[in-house]
């Protein structure tokens, strides 16, 4: 029974009865349960039409309504407050979660295919924490969209044709790869050294341009030769390191799409011709696409005069390929890509395709400062994770929850994944953020350990409980802590629906912290195993059991596992 929707439907009927008109109604939640579970201000909105004071309208409406699942309706200063019957509501909530288990929070399947592109870092060095924000938000959004019923395919767009990769190929012939290091880190060292070499010897720049031109020509002709093999090997080597980092954080892509695929297939040349035929292309030192009809003053550089393509052209082709294979596409991009994203989307519109949705994220830094790949000064995601794991292991040892080093390592790894992922995803993408260790590994207030610790508490309470009797559950006057946690638990499906709808995974992150904090208040104020009244004891055990399920299901949406012990 969806009490909230029942209230809204009943109020809409009442408004129609009073005015003959429709009204869009949204309910608020009072700050404390003793003030009601839901509240509406419709009396103020009706005052003009009914020519009555809001206070009087509220009292009339409150006295005239009867809603299933609501035990009291109260008019206070023009507002109408609704109080749920928590005995029935709690039984229904606990029963639903217990029956659905790991499926609680998942919505009905939709017949819609989504292509979600995230991470897509150039294969010229390890991921830095800016890439980390992209991958964590992207993977969390993927999980939330799947839970909300979409068929989701995640893609990583591999830039194997750009200047950066040509520099890596050029450098691999002059500097030895350190095979003792993780692949992407070794490639990164070559890239940094090669950039230094190019800065000191400007005449070498022509060799980079020749590599790019020769590689594209080989791809366009469908030729596989020594040069194409060098590019393929360099990219594959770096991707091996990338996949290792991603899997450490429980992130997996369904498909790696190489930029060169679209040159080899002839699709790039076909799209350039289609754009030329629009009459919107102008020629100066390059071919440029005029998008002024879409309010863009800057022209999109489409191709060189010799016909070779540019990254922007290949990106448009990649997006056409996506749009032809999905109902809608979502991209995760840094805020510095806003203009490029708009230009790509308007080019798609010009050719008659749907535009991609874009989730932009702002920069992330550490308190020590920001990162730069090109100059070789950056904090890699691998370093960030190892630091998180080291700090987590120290905390696990201090708390004495495990003595075996192997067990400490496993617990620390799960805490570290949670610390990194949760601390990133909890902040709205459009806000710049500083990654702070005291927040990421906070066991008391805002960190993922707070949530994982609440789960560990649930597990400890339940470890020796064989069965939970369903007899007379919640057949007593529940206190505010019990009501608060049950109401929170019931919200997961709507949280998933909302987060998917607005593409904001931080909604899920904020919700799961609320659940953990609500449970901790319940735990502090409501004895469970020591409760002597069997009805109350079993009801509280049911709350603990369903809290454990909701914490597991919700953190799974964020790609985070439970350590078990903490």
UniProtKB/Swiss-Prot annotation:
One of its GO terms (biological process) is arginyl-tRNA aminoacylation. GO terms for molecular function: arginine-tRNA ligase activity; ATP binding. It comes from the Archaea. Its EC number is 6.1.1.19. One of its GO terms (cellular component) is cytoplasm. It holds the Pfam family DALR_1. NCBIfam families: argS (TIGR00456). Disulfide bonds: none annotated. HAMAP family: Arg_tRNA_synth (MF_00123). Belongs to the class-I aminoacyl-tRNA synthetase family. It is an enzyme of class 6 (ligase). It comes from Methanococcus maripaludis (strain C5 / ATCC BAA-1333). PROSITE patterns: AA_TRNA_LIGASE_I. CDD domains: ArgRS_core. Keywords: Aminoacyl-tRNA synthetase, ATP-binding, Cytoplasm, Ligase, Nucleotide-binding, Protein biosynthesis. A motif ('HIGH' region) lies at residues 121-131. It is found in: Cytoplasm. Its main location: cytoplasm. It catalyses: tRNA(Arg) + L-arginine + ATP = L-arginyl-tRNA(Arg) + AMP + diphosphate. The keyword Mitochondrion does not apply. This is Arginine--tRNA ligase.
């Amino acid at each position: 029974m969806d009490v909230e929707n029942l209230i809204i439907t009943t109020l809409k009927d009442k408004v129609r009865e009073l005015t003959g008109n429709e009204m869009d109604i949204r309910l608020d939640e009072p700050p404390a349960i003793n003030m009601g579970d839901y509240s509406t201000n419709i009396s103020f909105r009706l005052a003009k039409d009914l020519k009555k004071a809001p206070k009087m309208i509220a009292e009339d409406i409150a006295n005239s309504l009867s809603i299933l699942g609501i035990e009291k309706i109260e008019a206070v200063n023009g507002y109408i407050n609704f109080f749920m019957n928590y005995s029935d509501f709690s039984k229904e909530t606990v029963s639903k979660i217990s029956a659905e288990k790991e499926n609680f929070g998942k919505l009905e399947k939709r017949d819609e295919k989504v292509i979600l592109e995230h991470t897509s870092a150039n294969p010229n060095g390890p991921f830095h924490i800016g890439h980390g924000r992209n991958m964590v938000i992207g993977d969390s959004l993927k999980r939330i969209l799947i839970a909300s019923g979409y068929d989701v395919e995640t893609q990583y767009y591999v830039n194997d044709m750009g200047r950066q990769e040509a520099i890596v190929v050029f450098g691999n012939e002059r500097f030895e790869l350190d095979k003792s290091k993780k692949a992407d880190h070794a490639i990164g060292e070559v890239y940094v050294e090669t950039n230094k070499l190019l800065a000191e010897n400007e005449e070498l720049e022509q060799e980079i341009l020749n590599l790019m031109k020769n590689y594209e020509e080989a791809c366009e002709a469908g030729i596989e030769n020594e040069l194409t093999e060098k590019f393929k090997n360099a990219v594959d080597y770096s991707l091996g390191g990338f996949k290792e980092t991603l899997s450490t954080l429980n992130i997996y892509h369904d498909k790696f799409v190489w930029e060169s695929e679209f040159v080899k297939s002839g699709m790039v040349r076909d799209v350039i011709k289609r754009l030329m035929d629009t009459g919107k292309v102008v020629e100066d030192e390059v071919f440029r696409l005029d998008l002024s009809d879409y309010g863009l003053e800057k022209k999109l550089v489409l191709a060189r005069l010799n016909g070779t393509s540019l990254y922007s052209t290949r990106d448009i082709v990649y997006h056409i390929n996506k749009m032809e294979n999905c109902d809608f596409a979502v991209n995760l991009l840094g805020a510095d890509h806003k203009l490029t994203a708009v230009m790509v989307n308007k080019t798609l519109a010009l050719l008659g395709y749907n535009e991609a949705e874009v989730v932009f994220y702002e920069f992330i830094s550490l308190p020590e400062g920001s990162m730069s790949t090109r100059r070789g000064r950056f904090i890699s995601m691998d370093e960030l994770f190892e630091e998180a794991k080291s700090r987590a292991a120290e905390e696990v040892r201090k708390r004495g929850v495990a003595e075996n080093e192997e067990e400490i390592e496993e617990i620390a790894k799960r805490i570290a994944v949670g610390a990194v992922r949760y601390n990133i995803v909890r902040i709205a993408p459009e806000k710049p953020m500083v990654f702070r260790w005291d927040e990421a590994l906070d066991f008391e207030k805002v960190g993922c350990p707070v949530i994982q610790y609440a789960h560990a508490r649930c597990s400890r309470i339940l470890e020796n409980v064989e069965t939970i009797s369903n007899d007379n559950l919640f057949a007593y006057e529940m206190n505010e802590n019990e009501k608060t946690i049950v109401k929170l638990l019931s919200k997961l499906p709507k949280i998933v629906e909302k987060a998917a709808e607005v593409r904001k995974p931080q909604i899920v992150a904020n919700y799961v912290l609320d659940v953990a904090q609500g449970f901790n208040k319940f735990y502090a104020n409501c004895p469970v195993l020591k409760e002597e009244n069997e009805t109350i004891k079993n009801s509280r055990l049911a709350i603990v059991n369903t809290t454990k399920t909701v914490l597991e299901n919700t953190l799974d949406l964020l790609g985070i596992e439970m350590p078990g012990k903490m």
